UniProtKB/Swiss-Prot annotation:
Residues 1-50 form a transit peptide. Belongs to the CarB family. It is found in: Plastid, Chloroplast. Residues 203-399, 761-954 form the ATP-grasp domain. Residues 1-10 have a biased composition (Polar residues). It comes from Oryza sativa subsp. japonica. The lineage of its organism: Eukaryota, Viridiplantae, Streptophyta, Embryophyta, Tracheophyta. Mg(2+) 2 binds at E370, N372. One of its GO terms (cellular component) is chloroplast. SMART domains: CPSase_L_D3, MGS. This is Carbamoyl phosphate synthase arginine-specific large chain, chloroplastic.
Length: 1172
């Protein structure tokens, strides 16, 4: 007879308490120490630290006088300008759309007129109905000053837009613009910003209140930095630039050469050409505290966060846990007192701040690392972890309210001055994209490199950790119980992966435990606290227990104990050699199902009015589903390259529209950065992994009328077929009783038809739609045969990808064979698509909208600036098109309409076309879902396409919406991609078919040249109006050289070029100065770049691989010296037009509302809501 988990004394055994269970081990039969499973403080007492508090531990505190107010509001303030964060970049992602959106709503709620400045069209905050005036364009001091002069706001709030907004505010103050225009800074004063961001001033402030900082010095030149390093006396050293984002330009130096390289980069990246050189605290533990202060000098601690990775890894790249788990209560109180003293000393009078500490695990010594005097990435995490809306509260504090005057939105009974108390554990794990940047080393340092993150909540650390791993969507259903590659590594390789921080270190820990390494040994190599390692070792022991049992031997109690440790059905299936379906059926037969707990800010001491849920395997369920009409919207999970904020934007619009139309909306997502996971975006929020198991659990509980899968990108689309199969098997009746639960919009079968190459080819042939010649290869010989038939170059990619993953243009058999062997491992189960690459073709993007009765409307037709072959997500594009003939546009409209009808699209569809130089049109791909261009198109045409699409899915027709024909605006909108190359040393910056951009900006003007110029400036590309241009074009593009050369000469630029390019220009009669290539001698192009003799570079490559070493070096050097670099001919043409526009006229600044003469671009929704 099988022994159960709960009955065998020689097996793993839980303690009686379900929420504080421990495991017993064979070896000791003693419970492992479980220190601070969660920290819970009572909500009853007013948890405010006041200035009258006496100094503790040698820490002194200061009081600042409160600003004058009018009944809780700042005197004389009626109109407020909010600065956004600009495009999504590494270190500054959609958490600032979340904070900016909260701030806009909070201030409008208080009756203020809000003016918003932001360059990112993919944000909710830039919707024209959120602020009274919305400016989408470059965020540079001169242009923002002109907007301030036009709008005349009374105050400027810079603390909601990350480092971008803070630096911009400092520049405006330093230039005297704010004083000249009578604008006051709110949220954080200029002295407070300087004291926190300026490394020297911060260090002095800490010295004044008796707090330690690491031994360090401030350098403004390389020579000063070297002198500081000599004074400190030993490597490794940490370099931290001032006024930068995500540790940009910083790093860890282990020797003199590395140190000098990092210092050069740091000085160039710093807003003030200042870096902090400090002694390394590698191996110390790192903690963060989120702090808020009001004008009456009340201070509350919102949340403590602990980094599992020790010091040396940027907190954005570290796995973090809230509340802190390994602090004693005395240690926590000490950090709390220090945080209060710091926020007062720095002078943040009203709003939130993030304070980071290092603690020596040997003796408890504490050092202060840094402080952010603004809403930060950690603030968003703390908000989602606790349910306390930090950004909203910070916005209200900035206009004079005190914490005890602001009600808690979740409880409705407590004020914001009650510190949140939580009875669960939150784990955040970052997501990386090193595979997108070949040549870059996957090592984590003080410079942030992650592109997204997933968060999970559980009653224990183990449960939340496993759910967070599952939420990452990197192929793991949890931690362990999988055939990971690290199990095959030798000891040296495994130890290296444990010692050197990297994205896969958690899997190396699993492999080390499986191979028999002890907790102490892993701790000594990795410096990860033994408490966390003990928790992880228990999970390995539970897995071993499962392996020793068959599925049918697991009792109900066994299931509960295993599920409470976060194990998914997939993991249990792997360990018990069964299938996920078998596990689910067995679990449900034993009546083991998750319950849902509420995030309520007060550990259940008060009733929560806002249903914000997470799952756990306990006995009481706090989710109370209704029998109203309702819709479940599946989000996009963690941000990644190819699937980012644009999809979250669509999910939010679906929730807004359907709530307005009378539906109860339920959001399910795992991304803490987003607006979709804000507590008030939907009627109910389930913060859960997006897997078949977790989604079907919510479906079983809620039984919604509809499920929306087409807005969250590839994540929910991959779930569509298994969810459809589940619904067909279960035949669940919706809670409202109006019919069966079903997937709304385009059917999963139609989605599959568009993704399956064979089915899709048959549909195109039936409709008479042309596509590039190509085929499906299931072996190397297949691929070579197809390439021979269609002719090189060819585009090769795996089927079912998003963001051009593993896509490449290859030019010969040798490169194709290498691609098949290294990039995709082609076989019959993993076919590869091989298509003819259309040289010099123009690429077109189309977003269309279709309803359930066959009406189709073109939302927008965009023309890419770069040629076909560069991923659409990395290419700039314009709307309307500028060079496409009416005939080609008619073909595109006809084919898009026919395809939407044939696929029975209900909702959004995106199509991509290529137009050859001879005017032939080819369809490249079609996606019956929301695309990443939907927010851009919506802003460009003044119609909220995602809102329309969600209403269409509910049964409203396009005529009922009043949206029946394509809108072609009089103005021109240009979208430009923002790329993160400066974060990935060693990788080339050439663009290709694999997407690598992290974000986007938008420029709007009545001429293309002006719109393109605005987009370039907004993306950080400084366009010079004169100087010297360096030209180096490869043989494929030299035929365009004369045109490009003449264009720059007509603008007054001098031209320098490498020998081959110079000869072509001289033959065309264009003046040019030849320059040596790097390998030809000196002075060469590299020397001229370093000497500041080159203002703009045009340098192309064949794109079949990294080109000559010279080209790679020059491109990387141009990036380091912030010289604009253009890598395509079409990009060079557009840049010439843009510079001409900038020379001929000043940049015009208009609000989005001015282009549409309305303050609400979604007014057509009124008819739809009444119709539905």
């Amino acid at each position: 007879m099988a022994t159960s988990l709960s009955s065998a004394p020689t097996q793993l055994r839980p303690s009686p308490s379900p929420s504080h269970h421990r495991l017993l081990h064979r070896s000791s039969l003693l419970p492992f120490p479980r220190r601070h499973h969660h920290r819970r403080r009572r909500c009853g007492a007013l948890s405010i630290a006041r200035a009258s508090a006496s100094a503790k531990d040698g820490v002194t505190v200061r009081r600042f006088p409160a600003a004058p107010t009018e009944g809780g509001r700042l005197a004389g303030v009626r109109k407020i300008m909010i600065l956004g964060a600009g495009p999504i970049v590494i270190g500054q992602a959609c958490e600032f759309d979340y904070s900016g959106t909260q701030a806009c709503k909070a201030l409008a709620e208080e009756g203020y007129e809000v003016v918003l400045v932001n360059s990112n069209p993919a944000t909710i905050m830039t919707d024209p109905d959120l602020a009274h005036r919305t400016y989408i364009g470059p965020m540079t001091p001169p242009l923002v000053e002109r907007i301030i002069a036009a709008e005349r706001p009374d105050a400027l709030l810079p603390t909601m837009g990350g480092q971008t907004a803070l630096n911009l505010a400092v520049s405006l103050a330093d230039s005297g613009a704010l004083d000249r225009l009578g604008v006051r800074l709110i949220g954080a004063s200029l002295p407070a910003i300087r004291a926190a961001e300026d490394r020297q001033l911060f260090k002095q402030a800490m010295d004044r209140i008796g707090l330690k900082t690491p031994p360090s010095g401030i350098g403004t030149t390389l020579e000063e930095c070297i002198s500081i390093a000599e004074d400190i006396g030993e490597f490794p050293l940490i370099v931290r630039p001032a006024f930068t984002l995500g540790g940009t330009g910083g790093g860890i130096a282990y020797n003199r050469a590395e140190f000098e390289d990092i210092c050069r980069a740091g000085l160039a990246a710093s807003h003030t050409q200042q870096v902090l050189v400090e002694k390394s605290l590698l191996g110390w533990k790192e903690y963060e505290l989120e702090v808020m202060r009001d004008m009456a000098d009340n201070v509350v601690i919102i949340c403590s966060i602990e980094n599992i990775d020790p010091m040396g890894v940027h907190t954005g790249d570290s796995i973090t846990v809230a509340p802190a788990q390994t602090l004693t209560d005395k240690e926590y109180q000490r950090l709390r007192d220090y945080s209060v003293a710091i926020i007062r000393e720095i002078g943040v009078e009203c709003g939130g701040s993030n304070v980071q500490f290092a603690v020596n695990p040997a003796d408890g010594e504490v050092m202060v690392i840094e402080m952010n005097p603004r809403v930060s990435r950690s603030s968003a995490l703390a908000s989602k972890a606790t349910g306390f809306p930090i950004a909203k509260m910070a916005a209200k504090l900035s206009v004079g309210y005190t914490l005890d005057q602001i009600p808690n939105d979740i409880t409705k009974k407590t004020p914001a001055s009650f510190e949140p108390s939580i009875d669960y554990v939150v784990t955040k794990i970052p997501r990386f994209a090193f595979e997108k940047f070949p040549g870059s080393e996957p090592v984590l340092t003080t410079q942030m490199k992650s592109v997204g993150e997933a968060m999970a909540l559980g009653r224990t650390f183990q449960e939340s950790f496993q759910k967070a791993v599952r939420s990452l969507e990197t192929g793991f259903a949890g931690w362990g119980c999988a055939p990971i590659k690290e199990l095959d590594w030798d000891w040296e390789k495994l130890k290296y992966s444990l010692r050197v921080p990297n994205p896969d270190r958690i899997h190396a820990i699993y492999a080390a435990f499986k191979k028999g390494m002890r907790i102490q040994d892993i701790h000594e190599i990795s410096f990860i606290d033994k408490w966390f390692l003990t928790e992880l070792k228990e999970l390995v022991d539970v897995e071993q227990f499962l392996i020793s049992r068959g599925l049918d031997q697991l009792s109900k109690d066994d299931f509960y104990q295993v599920k409470r440790r976060g194990f998914s059905d997939t993991q249990i299936a792997f360990a018990t050699s069964s299938s996920e379906t078998d596990v689910r059926l067995r679990r449900l037969a034993l009546e083991v199902a998750p319950t849902y707990k509420r995030v309520d800010t007060c550990a259940a001491e008060f009733e929560a009015n806002t249903p914000y849920m997470y799952s756990s395997y306990e006995y009481e369920c706090e989710s109370v589903p209704t029998n109203k009409k309702k819709v479940l919207i599946l989000g996009g999970g963690p941000n990644r390259i190819g699937q980012g904020i644009e999809f979250d934007y669509c999910c939010c619009h679906a929730s807004f529209a359907l709530r307005e139309a009378g539906y109860e909306t339920i959001m399910m997502n795992s991304n803490p950065e987003t607006v979709s996971t804000d507590y008030d975006t939907s009627d109910r929020l389930y913060f859960e992994p997006l897997t078949v198991e977790d989604v079907t659990n919510v479906i079983d509980l809620e039984r919604p009328d509809g499920i929306i899968v087409q807005f969250g990108g590839q994540t929910p689309l991959k779930l569509a077929l298994p969810i459809q199969q589940y619904l067909e098997d279960k035949k669940l009746v919706s809670a409202s009783g109006t019919g069966l639960v079903k997937i709304w919009g385009t059917s999963p079968d139609s989605i599959d038809a568009a993704e399956d190459r064979k089915r899709f080819n048959a549909i195109l042939e039936e409709l008479g739609i042309e596509q590039p010649k190509g085929g499906i290869a299931r072996s190397e010989s297949d691929a070579l045969s197809i390439a021979s038939e269609v002719g090189y170059p060819v585009v090769v990619r795996p089927s079912y990808v998003l963001g051009g993953r593993a896509m490449e243009i290859v030019y010969n058999d040798e490169k194709l064979i290498k691609y098949l062997a290294t990039a995709v491992q082609v076989d019959p189960e993993r076919p590869v698509l091989v298509d003819k690459y259309l040289i010099d073709a123009i690429e077109i993007d189309v977003d269309a909208l279709a309803d359930s009765v066959g009406n189709v409307v073109i939302g927008g037709i965009m023309e890419h600036i770069e040629q076909a072959g560069i991923h659409s997500g990395d290419s700039a594009c314009s709307l309307p098109t500028r060079t496409v003939s009416a005939k080609c546009l008619d073909i595109i409209r006809s084919w898009t309409t026919k395809l939407a009808k044939r696929l029975n699209v209900c909702g959004l569809m995106n199509c991509q076309y290529a137009i050859t130089t001879s005017g032939e049109v080819f369809l490249l791909e079609a996606n019956p879902r929301a695309s990443r261009t939907v927010p851009f198109v919506s802003k460009a045409i003044g119609h909220p396409l995602a809102k329309y699409a969600s209403l269409v899915m509910s049964g409203v027709t396009l005529p009922e919406l009043g949206y029946t024909q394509e809108v072609v605006p009089k103005h021109v909108s240009v979208k430009e991609a923002v790329l993160p190359f400066e974060k990935f040393q060693g990788c080339d910056i050439l663009l290709g078919p694999e997407m690598r951009s992290t974000g986007e900006v938008m420029g709007i003007d009545y001429e293309f040249s002006g719109a393109f110029a605005k987009a370039q400036i907004a993306a950080g590309q400084k366009l010079p109006l004169n100087g010297t241009v360096f030209l180096s074009l490869n043989d494929l593009t030299k035929r365009h050289l004369a045109e490009i050369g003449r264009g720059f000469r007509e603008l007054g630029f001098n031209i320098i070029a490498t020998s081959g390019t110079a000869k072509v220009l001289q033959l065309e009669g264009i003046p040019v100065e030849p320059v040596l290539k790097i390998h030809e001698g000196r002075p060469n192009a590299r020397d001229m770049l370093k000497n500041g003799q080159i203002q703009v570079m045009v340098i192309t490559s064949s794109g079949d691989a990294l080109d000559s070493k010279d080209g790679l070096q020059l491109r990387r050097l141009a990036l380091a010296y912030k010289v604009p670099i253009i890598t395509t001919v079409d990009g060079a043409r557009a840049t010439i037009d843009a510079i001409k526009s900038l020379k001929n006229k000043s940049i015009e600044t208009l609000a989005l509302q001015d282009y549409f003469q309305t303050t609400d671009a979604s007014q057509n929704l009124q008819a739809a809501q009444s119709a539905s």
